[in-house]
């Protein structure tokens, strides 16, 4: 448990009761089929033997042209129409570029990984789609898997795919693992997996650096309560680490109650620097233990971990928020490069709100308030536009200061819209009359809100 639980204002248990989450419903891309009933479909469990048999049958079954439909009770011999749905495995082998696999709602129980193979690609302007049908909620449930690094949930090794509106839980390793490039992952929820909820990395140990996943967009997604049962130091909310290329973006994503970090952008000496990652409009809170209190002494608990092994990578973090994480809000984690942080807010984290001990980092319009330890800000404080927390008080070279009165509310309230977007209400929003409004450079406010 957090050592700070005795603080009635900020204690983990007290806050957990005050934060409400509204899970997003899926959105259909394209036509809304209002004439088709949204019935509750039964669950089905596929063993490894059944998956193998399904794959064999799928190879000999020609599915309907165009969009395909799958359901928990779909049959591999069905053509994949809405009235006669097929299986997910069969649909993945035959969907054409520019077409969509629609998943009906219900529980899809698997004991082995669902893989979109290398070479199973869409194209620029003609993505292959794996999308929840209407407002229904398809749940890919891998709880039957054993804990182990080979037991991922959904593994996307192909390029140019849209994955939207899915819930993925219980995997023996990562919930979703992305080894392909130019994919769009939207409004997904990954939780209670036994490693990072959603991770990017090379599809094979033999993949060259030019094949590392690049130009993927993770949008409006939520990753929570992921925990590895062996040591509690591996399972993050989101990770683009070890073996990722350039151009990967996280936008409007939420990471909470993961046993290790919210985001992990770790580089390792053995594999060298990763490509620069961009994080926008995202929130990390209460990482370092799960919502039921699971943690270990090894659980780091950073909101945004932005490096590793003293390797330079110039990441970008903008308009993002870290609060009440076990350790740091934003940390360079030994990355001595030039990380650019713009209009971020960090509040009440277990150690420093901003921990950048070394490097040539660039800080613009960031706001730190009520950290447990002083901020460390090696680099350029552009135009003295940042308000830091040092020696238990705010500091700014131009005389700006932050107090509780500068915020409409310091009571966390987080919901998600139907599209998965984060809704914060008045939480950490600057109050009318605050001198932080309009004091940014070259214009605008200081902080994320």
Swiss-Prot record:
Its cofactor is Ca(2+). This is Pectate lyase L. GO terms for cellular component: extracellular region. It comes from the Bacteria. The keyword Glycoprotein does not apply. A lipid is attached at residue 27 (S-diacylglycerol cysteine). Transmembrane segments: none annotated. Presents an endo-cleaving activity on the homogalacturonan (HG) region in pectin with a preference for low- or unmethylated pectin. Optimum temperature is 40 degrees Celsius. It is found in: Secreted. The active site is at residue 305. It is an enzyme of class 4 (lyase). SMART domains: PbH1. Its EC number is 4.2.2.2. Belongs to the polysaccharide lyase 9 family. A lipid is attached at residue 27 (N-palmitoyl cysteine). Optimum pH is 10. Ca(2+) binds at residues 236, 260-261, 264. Keywords: Calcium, Lipoprotein, Lyase, Metal-binding, Palmitate, Repeat, Secreted, Signal. Residues 1-26 form the signal peptide. It catalyses: Eliminative cleavage of (1->4)-alpha-D-galacturonan to give oligosaccharides with 4-deoxy-alpha-D-galact-4-enuronosyl groups at their non-reducing ends. It comes from Paenibacillus polymyxa (strain SC2).
């Amino acid at each position: 448990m957090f050592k700070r639980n005795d603080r009635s204002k900020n204690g983990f248990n007290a806050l957990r009761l005050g934060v409400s989450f509204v899970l997003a419903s899926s959105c259909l891309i394209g036509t809304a089929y209002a004439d088709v009933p949204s019935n509750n479909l039964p669950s089905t469990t596929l063993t490894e033997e059944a998956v193998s048999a399904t794959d064999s049958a799928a190879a000999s079954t020609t599915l309907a042209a165009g969009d395909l439909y799958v359901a928990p009770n779909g049959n591999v011999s069905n053509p994949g129409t809405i009235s006669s749905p097929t299986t997910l495995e069969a649909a993945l082998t035959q969907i054409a570029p520019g077409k969509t696999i629609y998943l009906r709602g219900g529980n899809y129980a698997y004991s082995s990984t669902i893989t979109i193979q290398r070479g199973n690609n869409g194209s620029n302007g003609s993505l292959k789609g794996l999308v929840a049908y209407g407002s229904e909620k398809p749940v890919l449930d891998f709880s039957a898997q054993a804990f182990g690094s080979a037991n991922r949930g959904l593994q996307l090794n192909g390029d140019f795919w849209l994955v939207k509106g899915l819930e993925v839980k219980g995997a023996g390793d990562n919930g979703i693992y992305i080894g392909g490039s130019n994919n769009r992952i939207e409004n997904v929820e990954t939780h209670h997996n036994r490693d990072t909820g959603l991770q990017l990395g090379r599809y094979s140990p033999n993949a060259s650096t030019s094949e590392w996943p690049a130009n993927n967009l993770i949008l409006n997604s939520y990753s929570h309560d992921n925990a590895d049962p062996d040591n509690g130091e591996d399972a993050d909310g989101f990770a683009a680490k070890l073996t990722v290329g350039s151009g990967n973006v996280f936008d409007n994503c939420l990471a909470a109650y993961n046993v290790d970090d919210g985001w992990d952008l770790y580089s390792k000496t053995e594999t060298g620097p990763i490509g620069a990652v961009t994080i926008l409009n995202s929130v990390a809170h209460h990482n370092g233990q799960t919502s039921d209190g699971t943690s270990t002494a090894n659980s780091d608990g950073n909101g945004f971990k932005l490096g590793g092994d003293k390797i330079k990578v110039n990441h970008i973090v903008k308009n993002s928020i870290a609060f009440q994480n076990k350790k740091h809000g934003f940390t360079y984690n030994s990355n001595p490069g030039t990380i650019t942080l713009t209009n971020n807010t960090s509040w009440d984290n277990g150690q420093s709100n901003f921990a950048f001990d070394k490097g040539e980092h660039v800080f613009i319009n960031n706001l730190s308030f009520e950290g447990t330890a002083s901020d460390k800000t090696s680099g350029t404080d552009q135009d003295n536009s940042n308000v830091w927390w040092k020696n238990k008080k705010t500091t700014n070279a131009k005389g700006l200061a932050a107090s509780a009165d500068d915020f409409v509310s310091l009571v966390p309230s987080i919901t998600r819209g139907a599209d998965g977007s984060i809704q914060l209400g008045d939480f950490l929003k600057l109050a009318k009359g605050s001198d932080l409004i309009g004091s940014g450079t070259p214009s605008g406010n200081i902080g994320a809100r």
